[in-house]
């Protein structure tokens, strides 16, 4: 089983936090060469704090994917970090969350023989399921153009709120990710098409997914240097 669950910052064990921040350093600094802060072979920043919740995808005790959620009423990267890259950048009032630091560790995926499973679709679904479980109205994130295409190909009906230009003069986007039942069903249908097993509780949170062989993930995140949920820290 691949298990998806959430932990808040204060609930992270020392072992789990070291594993998470080490994987983030490998992804965002070593692989993508983002302008991020690293110490002791780990990547973390001021947004890793008591207001933060992490989504984990875990298989056989190892983290294979993760992302970070912060309620938009608290300081977040959209307003504090990325505002200079947009002519206008405003988040609507309401019960929303910001997503950042999303990654899928492809080395672990290969080592655990999971590359034939729709990991990225499951991670996207876990975002919806988590948000729905707590009554959030939607998710916002800053993404690159290639990442926007990945979301669109997944079937998730994300929308562009604002368009900006990064410090590398590349297009970046503030997007809204709906968490309604319709979009949840779209992703579940897509997952079932690729892995037609008896996964009857895909709308649940926490989320567990029964794995099998000979299924491909066409929407696996490709670790090219274009960034995922952002372009880097200032």
Regions found by a protein language model. Name each.
Residues 39-46, 162-165:
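Short, solvent-exposed loop/turn elements at beta->coil junctions and helix N-caps
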Residues 46-55, 74:
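A short helix-loop-beta-strand connector motif used in the catalytic cores of GNAT acetyltransferases and
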Residues 58-90:
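Short, His- and charge-rich active-site/binding loops that engage polyanionic ligands
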């Amino acid at each position: 089983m691949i298990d998806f669950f959430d932990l808040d910052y204060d609930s992270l064990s020392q072992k789990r936090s070291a594993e998470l921040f080490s994987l983030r350093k490998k992804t965002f600094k070593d692989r993508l060469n983002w302008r991020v802060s690293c110490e002791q072979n780990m990547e973390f920043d001021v947004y890793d704090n008591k207001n933060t919740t992490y989504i984990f995808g875990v298989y056989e005790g190892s983290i294979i994917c993760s992302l970070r959620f912060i309620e938009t009423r608290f300081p977040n990267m959209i307003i504090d970090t990325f505002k200079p890259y947009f002519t206008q950048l405003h988040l609507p009032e309401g019960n929303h969350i910001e997503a950042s630091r999303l990654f899928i560790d492809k080395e672990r995926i290969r080592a655990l023989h999971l590359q034939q499973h729709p990991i990225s679709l499951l991670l996207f679904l876990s975002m919806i399921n988590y948000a729905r479980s707590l009554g959030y109205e939607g998710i916002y994130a800053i993404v690159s153009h290639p990442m926007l295409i990945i979301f669109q190909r997944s079937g998730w009906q994300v929308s562009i709120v604002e368009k900006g230009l990064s410090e590398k003069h590349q297009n970046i986007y503030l997007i809204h990710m709906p968490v309604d039942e319709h979009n949840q069903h779209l992703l579940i249908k897509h997952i079932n098409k690729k892995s037609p097993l008896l996964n009857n509780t895909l709308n649940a949170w926490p989320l567990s997914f029964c794995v099998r062989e000979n299924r491909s993930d066409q929407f696996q995140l490709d670790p090219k240097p274009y960034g995922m949920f952002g372009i880097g820290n200032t």
